[in-house]
A protein has these predicted regions:
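Surface-exposed, low-hydrophobicity beta-strand/loop segments enriched in small/polar/acidic residues
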Residues: 1-108
Length: 108
């Protein structure tokens, strides 16, 4: 098999399959991982989706330890440590207390 280089991979071209505009910064589920919209992506249009990097994201209640695997819960639109019914998001690069509203997540 021959592999042909396409792009560095920190961001990918993503076609919005929905009838709604994806907002810049919005989390997008890719089934087994997440991406973050780098720009607004209108319905059926192609836009930039970050798939590597560190992002500050809203989190569910509860503490998150440094290094913990974290997941994106689409129904709450928050990061959690609960894998059930959620999409793998990455890992916490810093601890977050229960009362913290956000957590820093390394995706990709």
């Amino acid at each position: 098999m021959i592999a042909n280089y396409q792009q560095p991979g920190a961001a990918i071209d993503y076609t919005n399959p929905t009838s709604d505009t994806i907002k810049a910064g919005q989390v997008v589920s890719l089934t087994t991982r997440i991406g973050i919209a780098g720009t607004e992506i209108p319905a059926a249009a192609v836009g930039s989706l970050h798939v590597k990097g560190v992002f500050t994201m809203d989190k569910a209640s509860g503490a998150i330890a440094l290094g913990a695997a974290v997941y994106y819960n689409a129904s709450t639109d928050k990061i959690t440590t609960t894998a059930s019914s959620a999409v793998p998001a990455g890992w916490a690069i810093a601890a977050a207390k229960s009362e913290d509203a956000t957590v820093q997540v390394c995706i990709g």
